[in-house]
């Protein structure tokens, strides 16, 4: 019997499993980063990143997204710089992103170094969905956060029907967001 006789494509199923494994691997890496931050003394806040839906962390008075911050090392901007305009500038302007770890145990080189990159990366590369002149309101920020969370839940859903429901809800939230923006 060939793959087309019974309507089941083994290669497509394998590819789907590969994609799911890669997504699971990324989730494990994100979880490991968050665990490391907690062990280093960072605090997980009740807020979530507008871009990826990951919980925001606070360390040394700065709030950041561990996932987007990690992506910043790949020259991608974060949404947290736009959702927190009252953030103070980095405490140590001399720090570089690839510096060696400090000798004091109470500071985190990955947290401090990547946080120093945030304003530079955000100024250099703005995401398409975040215009520079538009002020954000709590309603738009909440809708953006909800859209990101719904999209993440849809990608994590095992049941296609559940994923479709999450995506429909995200679509409705996006339509509401479009009506709020001028």
From Swiss-Prot:
InterPro entries noted in UniProt: SSSCA1, UPF0148, UPF0148_domain
Region (Disordered): 1-162
Biased composition (Basic and acidic residues): 7-33, 47-62, 153-162
Superkingdom field: Archaea
Composition bias, Low complexity: 105-122
A family per Pfam: Auto_anti-p27
Family per record: Belongs to the UPF0148 family.
HAMAP family on file: UPF0148
Protein name per the record: UPF0148 protein VNG_2366C
Source taxonomy: Archaea, Methanobacteriati, Methanobacteriota, Stenosarchaea group, Halobacteria
């Amino acid at each position: 019997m060939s793959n087309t006789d019974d309507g089941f494509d083994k290669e497509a199923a394998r590819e789907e499993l590969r994609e799911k494994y890669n997504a699971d691997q990324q989730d494990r890496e994100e979880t490991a980063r968050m665990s490391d931050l907690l062990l280093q003394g960072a605090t997980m806040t009740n807020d979530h990143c507008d871009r990826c839906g990951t919980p925001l962390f606070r360390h040394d008075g700065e709030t950041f997204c561990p996932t987007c911050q990690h992506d910043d090392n790949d020259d991608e901007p974060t949404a947290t710089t736009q959702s927190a305009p009252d953030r103070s500038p980095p405490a140590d302007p001399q720090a570089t992103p690839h510096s060696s770890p400090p000798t004091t145990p109470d500071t985190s080189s990955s947290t401090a170094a990547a946080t120093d990159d945030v304003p530079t990366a955000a100024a250099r590369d703005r995401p398409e969905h975040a215009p520079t002149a538009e002020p954000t309101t709590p309603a738009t920020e909440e809708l953006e956060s909800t859209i990101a969370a719904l999209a993440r839940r849809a990608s994590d859903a095992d049941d296609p029907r559940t994923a479709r429901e999450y995506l429909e809800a995200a679509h409705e939230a996006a339509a509401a967001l479009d009506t709020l923006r001028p």
